């Protein structure tokens, strides 16, 4: 058995999980609703406020899908209950972020400001000029939106300038030593 897959998923009060015969999982909660189609070979059952994921055989593909399916459903349950967020920091002289309506506008040293429209289900917050918070209920979309923002200025290893995740550690390099 998969160590991840064999654990049942506890469904908190106020959250409903429904599974159709063709393995479409719908999770509704206080923050919204998520729908995802799971692989047809994996069996998903909802019993006594728990979601139980089982696999038909011990084939390598089924073992992999077992843990994956359980993790995806667990992420959906957490998302509609608590939501997800990623915090990005802008490090560099003149690097700033601000909101214009729902749109995120950043000055990153280019000749033009970088404007990013939020994808559906994602919101941006800027508590400080050098901090951006990406929030949403879908873990995959939150991570993708944060990665799209980060790719505009990846952190460089000499001074650490760029856009980095809050707890990310940038591996630093020493500069040239020069002639003596």
UniProtKB/Swiss-Prot annotation:
PROSITE patterns assigned: RIBOSOMAL_L6_1
Recorded superkingdom: Bacteria
Keywords from the named record: Ribonucleoprotein, Ribosomal protein, RNA-binding, rRNA-binding
Gene Ontology cellular-component annotations: cytosolic large ribosomal subunit
InterPro entries, per database record: Ribosomal_uL6-like, Ribosomal_uL6-like_a/b-dom_sf, Ribosomal_uL6_a/b-dom, Ribosomal_uL6_bac-type, Ribosomal_uL6_CS
Keyword Ligase: no
Pfam families found in the cross-reference section: Ribosomal_L6
Entry GO MF terms: rRNA binding; structural constituent of ribosome
GO terms, biological process: cytoplasmic translation
Family membership: Belongs to the universal ribosomal protein uL6 family.
Function recorded in the entry: This protein binds to the 23S rRNA, and is important in its secondary structure. It is located near the subunit interface in the base of the L7/L12 stalk, and near the tRNA binding site of the peptidyltransferase center.
Subunit comment: Part of the 50S ribosomal subunit.
Identification of the protein by name: Large ribosomal subunit protein uL6
The organism of origin for this protein: Clostridium botulinum (strain Eklund 17B / Type B)
Chain's gene name: rplF
